[in-house]
UniProtKB/Swiss-Prot annotation:
Lineage, uppermost ranks: Bacteria, Pseudomonadati, Bacteroidota, Bacteroidia, Bacteroidales
Subunit: Homodimer.
InterPro entries: Alpha/beta_knot_MTases, tRNA_m1G_MeTrfase_C_sf, tRNA_m1G_MeTrfase_TrmD, tRNA_m1G_MTases_N, tRNA_MeTrfase_TRMD/TRM10
Protein name: tRNA (guanine-N(1)-)-methyltransferase
Disulfide pairings: none
Catalytic reaction equation(s): guanosine(37) in tRNA + S-adenosyl-L-methionine = N(1)-methylguanosine(37) in tRNA + S-adenosyl-L-homocysteine + H(+)
Species in which this protein is naturally found: Porphyromonas gingivalis (strain ATCC BAA-308 / W83)
C-alpha cells in the first residue's frame, strides 16, 4: 500500500510514523509512505501557500494552485483510489472505515491548515473528507498520522499476530475485553481464574461477556437495538 501525504509540516508526521510498528512496515516494504512539502509547489517568492479570504473573513486560506500542482503531478505517476482531505467537517473516521481503506492500494491525504482550503479544492480535487473527531486542531498532520497508523496496522504482515487486529476494540462494534499477563497475582490483585483454566470455549465465552459488559458501561452508543 502507498500513502502520499501533502503537508506544510512533513517533519511532524515523519517523527510519528517512522518508528515502531509502522516504521518497520515501511522497512519491510509493506507500506510506502511519501511525505510531500506543499511549499515546494508554490511559485511565490516566499513559498507561501495561503492568502487572505475573499469577503473579509478573519484567518488565512490555503490556495488552490500549489495543491492542484502536487495532486496533478502525483496522478500522472499512478492511479489513486481516494484523495482525502483531513477536516473536522468530514465523515467520522472509525474502525470500519480503517478496515475499508486498508484494502485500497494508493491514497493521497491532504492536511488542512489555517482557516481552511479554497473551497474549489473540495469541489474538484478531493474525493473524500474525513474527520477524527468533533474538535479543531492547528493542522491536519495529527489526523493524517492517526488515520495512517490505524490503516497500516491492518495491512497483512504488519502485525506479527494478525489475530491481534481482529480482536481489537470496535472490530465487532464492541470494546475489547480485559487482558492480563504475568504475574498471575500482584499485591493480592488476581487475574480471573477463567483465564488460567486453559478451557478455550469458556475463555471465549468470558471474553465476549466482558466485551459486552464494558461496551454497555463505557460506550452504550455502540450497542445496537
Amino acid at each position: 500500500m502507498r500513502i502520499d501525504i501533502i503537508t506544510v509540516l512533513p517533519e511532524m508526521i515523519e517523527n510519528t510514523l517512522n518508528c515502531s510498528i509502522i516504521g518497520r512496515a515501511q522497512e519491510r516494504g509493506l507500506l510506502e509512505l511519501k511525505l510531500h512539502q506543499l511549499r515546494d509547489y508554490s511559485t511565490d517568492k516566499w513559498k507561501r501557500v495561503d492568502d487572505y479570504p475573499f469577503g473579509g473573513e478573519p484567518g488565512m486560506v490555503m490556495q488552490i494552485e500549489p495543491i492542484d500542482r502536487i495532486i496533478t503531478e502525483l496522478k500522472t505517476q499512478r492511479e489513486y483510489d481516494e484523495v482525502i482531505f483531513t477536516s473536522p467537517d468530514g465523515e467520522r473516521f472509525d474502525q470500519p472505515m480503517a478496515n475499508e481503506l486498508s484494502l485500497l492500494s494508493n491514497l493521497i491525504v491532504l492536511c488542512g491548515h489555517y482557516k481552511g482550503i479554497d473551497y474549489r479544492i473540495r469541489e474538484h480535487l478531493i474525493t473524500r473528507e474525513i474527520s477524527i473527531g468533533d474538535y479543531v486542531l492547528t493542522g491536519g498532520e495529527l489526523a493524517a498520522a492517526v488515520m495512517t497508523d490505524a490503516i497500516a496496522r491492518l495491512i497483512p504482515g504488519v502485525l506479527n499476530d494478525a489475530g491481534s487486529a481482529l480482536s481489537d476494540t470496535f472490530q465487532d462494534n464492541l470494546l475489547a475485553p480485559p487482558v492480563y499477563t504475568r504475574p498471575a497475582e500482584y499485591k493480592g490483585w488476581r487475574v480471573p481464574d477463567i483465564l488460567l483454566s486453559g478451557h478455550e470455549a469458556n475463555i471465549a465465552k468470558w471474553r465476549l461477556e466482558q466485551a459486552v459488559e464494558r461496551t454497555k458501561r463505557l460506550r452504550p452508543d455502540l450497542i445496537k437495538d
